Regions:
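Bacterial Sec-dependent N-terminal signal peptides
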Residues: 1-26
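Positively charged
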Residues: 18-222
Length: 222
């Protein structure tokens, strides 16, 4: 996502339906090759390319514990942040399909958190979320401007929920299991964590998680 401004809105709290997690899998050889052969940033797929569009329109799957504990995942997380923050993109979020991997991984700038130093300048931090799903969405919605790295030179107002509950794999706990059990950590259920997010950051999460379902913001225009 590459629209950085959204007006402040009043937020309410609510109850909603839940979504079960999908199946997990290891990186394929093609995915490992893509990650390992990428330089400092990855190519961003766009709808202007037919082959790219097929990837952008496909649903993404979760990663296994083995994949998440691999150097390939660590490298992927670094590359996704480097790509979305590169001056050629200057985005606020990016999803796996946008860099060629139909995996449920997103990198999101947390405007709801305190700024940190980045290249000597204070800015809101980017964080990477593996196996992410939206569990609950608020009934309260609002329109706001959105753009997309994969839909060049366009923007539009999109109706989004003002608050969401997300669930994703807790990498800190997963790494703790690895330290405790070694490779046996992969035999345990993946530890998860939930987070309630509101405001502009909630909009970014919805936009990026849409990508994991093969949905682009232009599909939501009325």
């Amino acid at each position: 996502m590459n629209i950085r401004n959204l007006g402040a809105t009043a937020f309410l709290l609510f109850l909603f339906s839940c979504r079960p997690a999908g199946c997990c899998g290891d990186f394929t050889e093609a995915e490992r090759t893509l990650i390992r052969e990428s330089d400092s940033i990855m190519r961003v797929l766009t709808i202007e390319n037919a082959a790219d569009n097929m990837v952008l329109r496909a649903k993404s799957s979760d990663l296994s514990g083995k994949a998440l504990l691999s150097s390939d995942y660590e490298r992927l997380a670094e590359l996704m942040v480097a790509t979305v923050t590169h001056p050629s993109q200057d985005g606020v979020g990016i999803a796996g399909p946008q860099v060629g991997l139909n995996r449920r991984v997103v990198a999101v700038q947390r405007f709801d958190k305190e700024p940190v130093l980045c290249d000597g300048k204070p800015d809101h931090p980017f964080e990477v979320y593996p196996n992410i799903h939206i569990i609950c969405m608020s009934d309260s919605q609002a329109y706001g401007p959105e753009g997309c790295l994969s839909v060049p030179d366009r923007s539009a107002d999109v109706l989004r929920s003002q608050r969401v509950v997300i669930e994703y794999t807790d990498m800190s706990r997963l790494k703790h299991l690895e330290r405790k059990y070694g490779k046996g950590a992969c035999n345990y259920p993946l530890p998860t964590i939930r987070d309630t997010v509101s405001g502009f950051t909630a909009v970014i999460f919805q936009h990026e998680i849409d990508h994991l379902e093969g949905i682009l913001y232009i599909d939501r225009l009325q």
